[in-house]
Amino acid sequence: MTVTVAYLGPAGTFTEAALWKFHEQTLPDVTVQPLPVDSPAMALDAVRSGDADYACVAIENSVDGPVTPTFDALAAAPGVQIYGETDIDITFAIMMRPEFDSATIRTFSTHPVARQQVADWVADNLPEVDFIPASSNAAAAQAVAEGRVDAAAAPERAADLFNLEVVARDIADVRGAHTRFVLVGQSGVPCPRTGDDRTSVVFNLPQRPGTLVGALTEFALRGVDLSRIESRPTRTNIGTYRFHVDLNGHIDDAPVAEAISALYLRCDDLTYLGSWPAARREGEQVRNNTVARIAEAHAWVERMRRGDIPERRNPE
């Protein structure tokens, strides 16, 4: 079986590296056909149109936060859902054409997000260069190979792909930087619950005082931990926003399902973007186990309904 996965190209991007990691971890039993595109929006549109089975897109960076083009594209239209996530460590190589004199570098290119992650190095080593933004880091490397710019910051693999010379390796202003990528397909049955999951929703609220507080209270009352909340303009009127929320838990967890059901009653619009296994970095722990404790409490009540009256155990 062959599946097509759209990703921010060309070959050599961190997104491509995430794609192959998904192939290993999430899609091991299929043949993957990569489909390079020019933006996260194009990758998601390829899924909606059926031109791709999945899209691999960056969603959050540990240094710069949310990847807003991805959030906007996820909310732009229905029909897509997240089925997995993975983390990629981010370091850059500085590259140029082999015959080029590094002392004469005048133009420098990379993706705008990447620029922020190598800004200190560039300021120290290339203080006079003009920045030329690229649609991706690998596209910047391609521009160097084609002679349109003098140097680029990109994954080191891009230098091999475009026959460039690496003049500096392992460049990162913040050590330990990493980016979370998600695998997005057409809407369907969510991934099975694992007990360590993430769920995402997008919603709009009526323009009344207290509506956001009320919406978030539905999660707090049920002990559902939010791992991220972002607001993005609806692009219809000034001052109108949609909210993106990630939470720890699965739609099959009773507290999560109850919170989302209550949220539905409060919202003008609510989109469920899926529940999927969380990718934890080494040493990272789930911030609390409230959802698990509430599930334990529900099971305790069910035993009473069956006439099996258990002794209540005090919380640890």
Q: Predicted regions: what is each one?
A:
Residues M1-E316:
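Domain-level signature for soluble enzymes in the chorismate/prephenate branch of the shikimate pathway
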